[in-house]
């Protein structure tokens, strides 16, 4: 998947949807990166089909999450470079990201960013400011069940489901007692 410039970037063409995967890794940096070479590749890739709904898949989200030590700030140069490319392409419906080890949904530039939790330990959901000079014993990484996202294209929108890979206690099952509810719900919908 090398794009010819040493970055792992590629496009998946589906019948009704495009997924453009970009490399936001920079050696020696924890946060994201997006240089002019990557910007040129993304701009050219997006220009190939301006009509088909497209989602950009990337590790680092270009937004502040509220988990301060994991934030990406809007004034970081790579964010401006990336944002300028995306603004030129109206077919980009949203972004699919990771990095935060926490499920987050963000409205960004008129698009939706879906950020998935991790299949490894999670980042603690702590929205307090953090002082780099004064450790305060807050939890930073927590042992929650591994998590994942399932993205489903319904022909109009991308629908994202988030779940944890642990066992779940069943509270209700589809049996004769719930059959009337299911029938009522289906009767409310247009026939297909």
Language-model region placement:
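Short acidic, glycine-rich surface-loop motifs adjacent to enzyme active sites
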Residues: 49-66
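Short acidic, glycine/proline-rich loop/turn micro-motifs
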Residues: 23-25, 66-70, 126-127
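Short glycine/proline- and charge-enriched loop/turn segments
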Residues: 1, 64, 71, 130-133
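A contiguous binding-surface segment within folded domains or other stable secondary-structure elements
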Residues: 62, 66-87, 92, 99-102
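Active-site environment of divalent metal-dependent phosphoester hydrolases
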Residues: 27-30, 61-66, 93-107, 121-122
């Amino acid at each position: 998947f090398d794009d010819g410039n040493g970055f792992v970037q590629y496009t998946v063409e589906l019948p009704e949807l495009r997924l453009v995967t970009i490399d936001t890794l920079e050696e020696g940096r924890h946060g994201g990166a997006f240089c002019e070479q990557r910007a040129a590749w993304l701009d050219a890739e997006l220009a190939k089909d301006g009509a088909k709904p497209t989602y950009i898949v990337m590790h680092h989200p270009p937004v502040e999450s509220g988990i301060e030590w994991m934030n990406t700030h809007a004034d970081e140069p790579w964010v401006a470079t990336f944002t300028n490319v995306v603004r030129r392409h109206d077919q980009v419906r949203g972004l699919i990201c990771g990095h935060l080890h926490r499920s987050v949904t963000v409205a960004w530039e008129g698009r939706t960013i879906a950020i998935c939790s991790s299949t490894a330990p999670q980042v603690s959901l702590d929205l307090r400011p953090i002082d780099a000079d004064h450790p305060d014993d807050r939890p930073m990484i927590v042992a929650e069940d591994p998590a994942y996202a399932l993205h489903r294209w319904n022909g109009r929108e991308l629908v994202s489901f988030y779940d944890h890979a642990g066992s779940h206690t069943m509270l209700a099952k589809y049996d004769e007692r719930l059959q009337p509810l299911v029938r009522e719900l289906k009767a409310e919908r247009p026939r297909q």
